[in-house]
Amino acid sequence: MDSQLACPPNVFNYIESNRDEYQLSHDLTEIILQFPSTASQLSARLSRSCMKIDHCVIEFRQQVPINATGSVVVEIHDKRMTDNESLQASWTFPVRCNIDLHYFSSSFFSLKDPIPWKLYYKVCDSNVHQRTHFAKFKGKLKLSTAKHSVDIPFRAPTVKILSKQFTDKDVDFSHVGYGKWDRKMIRSASTSTIGLTGPIELRPGESWASRSTIGPSPSYAGSDQGDAMHPYKHLNRLGTTILDPGESASIIGAERTQSNITMSMVQLNEIVRATVQECINTNCTPSQPKTLQ
């Protein structure tokens, strides 16, 4: 497969690393890239510039027997991200395939931080012993600086296959997608009146069901996000009998308590007798006898 690059690499514009041998490993192992010198980085830092990778070329040259099997995985990571989100681009290709990998950066980085990009490789499902020096890697970097970052048009990674026995059907490569973003509403007087962060205020002639249909944006209408934020927004289409919640929990609990009281006739007679006796003792006092003078 021919390279899809518009401009082939020019060695005079690229910083080249040494073509070094690397041992076969089933775990991710770093490929050392040559970055600008400390003096160059300091000069760019003093000029308050930021930097990006315009183009990165990773050359892979295999040195294994013709019956060697397995796949090589090469990954570029951005260490500004968390470990599980740092992967930016990856390639897979046969271990016997001589190939050039091409990568284009989509972001700037500050020279006040360490250079964030790291390059790794590993070999999967191979019949070659581990720690065998199975290939040579060489990196070429073209970087640029700017006074401030700007939007960079996305350019997909690509490859140039140099071994004639392999085609584009034997390789694969990918790039990470754009990060997802959800709008966060700001708490204000307007948001408190539409029921997002404050209670819904019912006005004359309105019901809870109709007021709860108010959302932050018409774009949420009919969407899963809108349904999640306003699960009762369609209640106003139901009749009042369906919306009636029925008796409260306290009334139901009281009725259950009353219905569970059981008493025998002897206990009931004893309560009545004690009650009557108490009333007599309290309200019925005997009159004092009159004496004759």
From Swiss-Prot:
Cellular component GO terms, alphabetical: host cell endoplasmic reticulum membrane; host cell plasma membrane; membrane
Keywords, in A-Z order: DNA-binding, Host cell membrane, Host endoplasmic reticulum, Host membrane, Host microsome, Membrane, Phosphoprotein, Transport, Viral movement protein
Upper taxonomic lineage: Viruses, Monodnaviria, Shotokuvirae, Cressdnaviricota, Repensiviricetes
The organism of origin for this protein: Tomato golden mosaic virus (strain Yellow vein)
Domain of life: Viruses
Subunit comment: Binds to dimeric supercoiled plasmid DNA.
Family matches, as Pfam families: Gemini_BL1 (PF00845)
GO molecular function, one term: DNA binding
Role description: Movement protein involved in the cell-to-cell and systemic transport of viral genomic DNA. Begomoviruses use 2 proteins to transport their DNA from cell to cell. The nuclear shuttle protein (NSP) shuttles it between nucleus and cytoplasm and the movement protein (MP) probably transports the DNA-NSP complex to the cell periphery and facilitates further movement across the cell wall.
Protein name as annotated: Movement protein BC1
Family statement: Belongs to the begomovirus movement protein BC1 family.
Record GO biological process: transport of virus in host, cell to cell
Annotated compartments: Host cell membrane; Host microsome membrane; Host endoplasmic reticulum membrane
InterPro entries for this protein: Gemini_BL
